């Protein structure tokens, strides 16, 4: 059989709408309010494990704030900031507090649990602080099934189970794989099945 190089298209532009909330509904609502200028709290800090959606949410809020003309600053991976960068963020916080604006920051742990300057950690903890909980397997499965339905694709349970067991577990990768599987199904003129998925995964896949 002819080998095909299937391009798995880049994930959609991050938005609050295409973020699967799981147990993070309250955080999502607060971010929406802040990024549109409707929230009482202008300072939000998100923390959680890699793949929990922190960067997705920061980028989504940046875009939303631009649309609404809101002055918003984001700071990702604050646990990696150098001493000078921490001072800059501290000064930015104070400036936004005095002049108006929104700051949304994110890191791997709660502010007081990281090796940050005391003054910066205190500032970050003053606002709303949310731990982002990763999706459960059931929630990931629901998200994949919904994504498949949007494409008019009938997705067998065994395909979902295989994806969750053998692929990277972040949603962009999982959904991009489903998109490629849908294209491969049309190319091969075969229904979506587990054998077809295994065949797809034998091909060189471009996921960049």
Model-based region annotation:
Residues 111-125:
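Short regulatory helix/loop adjacent to the ATP-binding pocket of P-loop NTPases
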Residues 127, 142-154:
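Conserved AAA+ ATPase "sensor/coupling" helix adjacent to the nucleotide-binding pocket
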Residues 161-165, 172-186:
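C-terminal helical "lid" of AAA+/P-loop NTPase domains
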């Amino acid at each position: 059989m002819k080998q095909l190089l299937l391009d798995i298209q880049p994930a959609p532009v991050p938005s609050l709408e295409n973020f699967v909330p799981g147990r993070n509904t309250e955080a999502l609502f607060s971010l929406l309010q802040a990024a549109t200028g409707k929230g009482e709290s202008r300072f939000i800090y998100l923390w959680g494990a890699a793949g929990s959606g922190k960067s997705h949410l920061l980028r989504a809020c940046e875009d939303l704030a631009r649309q609404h003309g809101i002055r918003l600053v984001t700071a990702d991976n604050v646990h990696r900031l150098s001493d000078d960068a921490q001072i800059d963020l501290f000064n930015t916080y104070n400036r936004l507090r005095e002049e108006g604006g929104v700051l949304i920051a994110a890191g791997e742990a709660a502010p007081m649990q990281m090796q940050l300057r005391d003054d910066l950690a205190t500032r970050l903890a003053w606002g709303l602080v949310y731990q982002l909980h990763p999706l459960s397997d059931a929630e990931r499965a629901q998200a994949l099934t919904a994504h498949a339905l949007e494409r008019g694709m009938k997705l067998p349970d065994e395909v979902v189970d295989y994806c969750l067991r053998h692929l990277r577990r972040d949603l962009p990768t999982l959904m991009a794989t489903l998109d490629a599987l849908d294209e491969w199904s049309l190319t091969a003129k075969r229904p979506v099945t587990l054998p077809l998925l295994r065949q797809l995964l034998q091909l060189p896949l471009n996921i960049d």
